[in-house]
């Protein structure tokens, strides 16, 4: 991570993020750096976990993990399978109609959950009636 005006140092087992500028934009970026560092330290100590729920009414959705991808079969009775990429660093556990995503990188786990949710987006139909999909139900 690099940004003009922000210095990152490690002194005596402490991470120091500092700036000499008084500008709001640089202070905002300083806070962003600090937040990312805290998330990284927390992720190493305790993994981030997202819980997802498979919801369907008529056509049972079937899930399989296939070579780094989540294969979603029989979504709304479709013949073609839908896929969502599962990057390295994210562990996925499928049990019945629940999916648990875990990993040390908060952004990566959250992005993966979002990709899975978007892979089952209903298009061209009334979403009040067709509520099938895979949804995020918990974050930890």
Predicted regions, residues:
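Ribosome-associated RNA-binding proteins
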Residues: 1-140
């Amino acid at each position: 991570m690099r940004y003009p005006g922000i210095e990152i140092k490690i002194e005596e087992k402490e991470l120091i993020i500092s700036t000499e500028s008084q500008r709001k934009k640089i202070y905002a970026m300083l806070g962003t750096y600090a937040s990312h560092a805290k998330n990284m330290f927390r992720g190493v100590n305790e993994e981030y976990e997202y819980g997802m729920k498979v919801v369907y009414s008529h056509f049972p959705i079937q899930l399989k993990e296939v070579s780094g991808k989540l294969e979603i079969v029989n979504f709304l009775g479709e013949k073609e399978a839908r896929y969502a990429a599962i990057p390295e660093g994210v562990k996925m556990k499928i049990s019945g109609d629940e999916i648990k995503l875990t990993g040390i990188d908060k952004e990566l786990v959250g992005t993966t959950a979002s990709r899975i949710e978007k892979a089952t987006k209903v298009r061209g139909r009334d979403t009040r009636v067709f509520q099938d999909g895979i949804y995020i139900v918990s974050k930890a």
